[in-house]
Design a protein with these regions (language model features):
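Outer-membrane beta-barrel porins/channels
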Residues: 1-23, 27-29, 48-50, 56, ...
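N-terminal periplasmic accessory domains that precede
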Residues: 34-45
Length: 197
């Protein structure tokens, strides 16, 4: 699918080496330390608290970082919170004359709050509520920020000791909303929609 160039790509990259190596197919598999990232319904089946942190240096001065915490909420629920950040630093700014100005950086942030509930002992549903923000430098003194909200919904069915079925819909209504009135004379509101997968 051609989702790479669309908004919110940092949420589709994968967080842990194991999940990336397995192609991101973790909807029905528990990703240790990042239990609710691939399917929020996992929070209702947790036995132990899950805490994880990840940092990755990527090419072209990009970086990806994440922190996650999830725990069961007895008797049949689970909660979690996670933060994912992606950004680029050391962007060389330029004046309109072409001369170098100061270095700038850009960054995308997602704060995810998770709740999951077991309906019966072997089925759970869960949701991630996302607060989204993108900070983008325009010039040395001007910066524009886009923000929005989004949701993930997941279902998990424990079909047996070694069999699990998972379904997840990622980035329902997720978007960045921008307003460029203060930066450009003909600016205005604009919305970048995330692809729903």
């Amino acid at each position: 699918q051609d989702w790479g160039g669309q908004s919110g790509g940092f949420l589709r990259m994968g967080i842990t080496a194991r999940s990336i190596a397995m192609g991101g197919g973790f909807t029905a598999e528990l990703d240790q330390s990042f239990a609710t990232f691939h399917n929020p319904a996992w929070a209702a089946f947790l036995i132990h608290r899950q805490l994880g942190s990840s940092y990755t240096n990527l090419t072209m001065d990009r970086r990806l970082a994440a922190t996650s915490f999830a725990t069961s909420l007895p008797p049949t629920a689970g909660v979690g919170v996670a933060w994912v950040f992606a950004g680029v630093n050391d962007i060389q700014g330029r004046y309109s004359t072409g001369m170098k100005s100061s270095k700038m950086q850009t960054g995308e942030n997602a704060l995810m709050i998770t709740f999951a509930q077991r309906i019966v002992p072997w089925i759970s549903i869960g949701a991630n509520f996302k607060l989204l923000r993108y900070d983008l430098p325009i010039t040395e003194s001007d910066q524009i920020s886009g923000s929005g909200i989004g949701f993930d919904i997941g279902l998990l069915i424990k079909a047996g000791t070694y069999s699990t079925l998972g379904i997840m819909v990622q980035d329902l209504s997720s978007n960045y909303q921008w307003n460029t009135n203060e930066i450009y004379t003909q600016g205005g509101p604009y919305k970048d929609e995330f692809p729903t997968i």
